[in-house]
């Protein structure tokens, strides 16, 4: 299992969005973002060993999946509080795994390589490889920039699991997005969610993101980084390489100020397809709350906020306003941390 990299012998490849890590206790975390402190990886617990769990690893260990962010934090607070820490750069409590507590690193690119050379794939793994081949060919990119993440990466998928892919590189991500746009219009290999599928997705998402059903349907049916391939749900993350991100851990400091609700016009959506995603704002009008500096952008580390608005849209945003401190201080709004957080085009 080459995709399982022993922490003591791992390469110098950066551990970023799309990777999973397993702790000494057997907890499995999914890595968040591209900025991490030198002594730990910012990651959120996803699978926990449980004798009654409905997922079984290749090593025969039963696991249970934790879904909502609130449930993940409650579990760690009760059982493993040392995986919650205060981060001085992000100015808040985060989940994170110290390097010394990591047993394995699950590498999405290595996992794909393993699947591509395997002669004994299950139906879901086979469909995942076929989707990779289709996307890579249509986008004209190397398969070496694509990885398998999610439950397939850690070997805890079931027959009904979805296909989670990650594409690394800004240029590669844009090429994949354009290819998916063409493929989605053709509706031959992939198709968008239908109404029934979107309603099921709404029930799942509403566990920790609350927006009206009719609004949800209007927004989600336009998205192409998610959909159906050969009867299976897919979800594709586009992730910039660390050197393309334009920021290293500690370059800026983020100070949460409080909640804010605002109306603004989206002036730039170039980063709206990536994870983390970002929307540049113009003509910001604060409806409630306070920001000590001009609010320039809205950011999210959650995939569900990608493709949420288009350039020129007037949007309603509610989330945590943060003071971004570097050479030029400004404010941004972070969405996705709390169920009340929203980023909704006013026209829908």
Q: What are these language model-derived features?
A:
Residues 1-160, 168-348:
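Catalytic core of pol beta-like nucleotidyltransferases
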């Amino acid at each position: 299992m080459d995709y399982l990299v022993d922490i003591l012998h791992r390469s110098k490849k950066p551990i970023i969005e799309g990777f999973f890590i397993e702790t000494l206790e057997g907890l499995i975390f999914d890595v968040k973002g591209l900025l991490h402190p030198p002594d730990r990886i910012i990651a959120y617990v996803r699978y926990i060993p449980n004798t009654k769990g409905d997922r079984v690893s290749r090593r025969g260990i039963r696991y249970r999946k934790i879904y909502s962010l609130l449930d993940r934090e409650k579990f760690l607070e009760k059982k493993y509080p040392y995986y919650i820490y205060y981060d001085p750069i992000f100015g808040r409590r985060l989940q994170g795994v110290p390097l010394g507590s990591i047993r394995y690193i699950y590498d999405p690119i290595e996992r794909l390589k393993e699947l591509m050379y395997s002669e004994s794939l299950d139906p879901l793994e086979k469909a995942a490889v076929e989707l990779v081949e289709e996307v890579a060919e249509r986008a004209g990119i190397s398969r070496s920039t694509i990885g398998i993440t999610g439950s397939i990466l850690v070997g805890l998928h079931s027959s009904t699991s979805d296909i989670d892919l990650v594409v690394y590189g800004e240029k590669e991500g844009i090429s994949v997005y354009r290819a998916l746009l063409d493929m989605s219009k053709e509706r031959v290999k992939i198709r968008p969610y239908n109404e029934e599928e979107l309603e099921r997705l709404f029930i799942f998402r509403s566990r920790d993101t609350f927006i009206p059903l009719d609004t949800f349907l209007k927004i989600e049916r336009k998205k192409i980084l998610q959909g159906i391939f050969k009867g299976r749900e897919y979800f594709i993350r586009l992730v910039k390489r660390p050197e393309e991100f334009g920021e290293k851990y500690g370059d800026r400091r983020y100070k949460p100020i409080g909640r804010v609700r605002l109306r603004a016009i989206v002036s730039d959506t170039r980063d709206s397809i990536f994870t983390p995603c970002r929307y540049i704002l113009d003509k910001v009008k604060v409806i409630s709350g306070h920001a000590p500096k001009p609010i320039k952008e809205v950011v999210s580390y959650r995939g569900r906020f990608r493709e949420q608005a288009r350039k020129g849209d007037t949007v309603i945003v509610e989330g945590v306003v943060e003071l971004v401190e570097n050479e030029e201080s400004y404010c941004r709004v972070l969405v996705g941390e709390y169920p009340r957080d929203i980023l909704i085009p006013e026209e829908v």
